[in-house]
């Protein structure tokens, strides 16, 4: 699979953001990408959550997601992107990561579970958290993906849940706000999630000034294969399933856990048979 990390700089203008998304997705398609990942809140973004997010929120069959579906279908690549989804609460929409396959079909919608209530920021003041249930991986481009959103990265149990379900690639769509040590934390956490789950971890964050940028792909051994600076940009990298299988064969840590957590559902994908307690 050829993966494109699309580091955009969304603003508080849905139409303008859609134009930027269309341009960068076209660039990813021209580079031969099978999947392009866009940031959290790619549809609409501000430095702080306010009532305007509820005003612009759309259902999953609304015009913004429909435009993403049309892009995917026309250009023949899968898209993962952050949208503001209307919820049952008229004042608090969901922060949702949609997954659209290369045929333009919506195959997944992950609603952010862990809202950002830290560093003086309150995402929950205007965003409704997703259901407290284990999300399922989505299949795009022949790989199993585990969608996550920003602050989710700090909760290893979500990544481990995805790994136990056979996920090959963790995808963290983010708006990682700047601050002391935040860039180092972002990079370290992505590398840690990749190493401890022997999978790829792609982090795609908004560009400056709202976010730090610094989108990257961490390999299962923690090596950073591609990265961006704080400016808008596109990075393309090839993912080799054979290399993933080799790393899992060398380090079968997912099969060697002993603290009562479930083992991978498909042992063959983890580099060996499932071991029962």
Locate the predicted segments by residue.
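Cys-nucleophile CN-hydrolase/nitrilase-fold catalytic domain and related Cys-dependent amidase chemistry
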Residues: 14, 22-103, 177-196
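CN hydrolase (nitrilase-like) catalytic-core segments centered on the catalytic cysteine
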Residues: 60-80, 144, 153-233
């Amino acid at each position: 699979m050829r993966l494109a990390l699309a580091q955009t700089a969304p603003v508080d203008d849905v139409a303008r953001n859609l134009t930027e998304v269309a341009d960068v997705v076209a660039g990813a398609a021209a580079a031969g990408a099978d999947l392009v990942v866009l940031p959290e809140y790619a549809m609409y973004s501000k430095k702080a959550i306010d009532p305007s997010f509820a005003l612009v929120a759309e259902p999953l069959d609304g015009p913004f997601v429909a435009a993403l579906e049309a892009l995917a279908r026309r250009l023949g690549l899968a898209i993962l992107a952050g949208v503001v989804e209307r919820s049952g609460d008229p004042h608090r929409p969901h922060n949702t990561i949609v997954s659209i396959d290369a045929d333009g079909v919506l195959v997944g919608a992950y609603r952010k579970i862990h809202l950002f209530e830290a560093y003086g920021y309150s995402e929950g003041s205007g965003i409704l958290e997703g259901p407290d249930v284990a999300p399922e991986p989505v299949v795009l481009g022949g790989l199993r993906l585990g969608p996550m959103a920003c602050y989710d990265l700090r909760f290893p149990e979500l990544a481990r849940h995805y790994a136990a379900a056979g996920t090959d690639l963790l995808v963290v769509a983010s708006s990682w706000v700047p601050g002391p040590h935040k860039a180092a934390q972002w990079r370290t956490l992505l590398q840690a999630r990749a190493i401890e789950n022997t999978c790829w971890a792609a982090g795609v964050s908004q560009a400056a000034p709202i976010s730090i940028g610094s989108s990257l792909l961490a390999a299962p051994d923690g090596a950073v294969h591609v990265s961006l600076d704080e400016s808008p940009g596109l990075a393309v990298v090839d993912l080799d399933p054979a290399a993933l299988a080799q790393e899992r064969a060398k380090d079968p840590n997912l099969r060697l856990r002993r603290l009562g957590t479930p083992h991978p559902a498909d042992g063959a994908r983890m580099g060996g048979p499932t071991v029962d307690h």
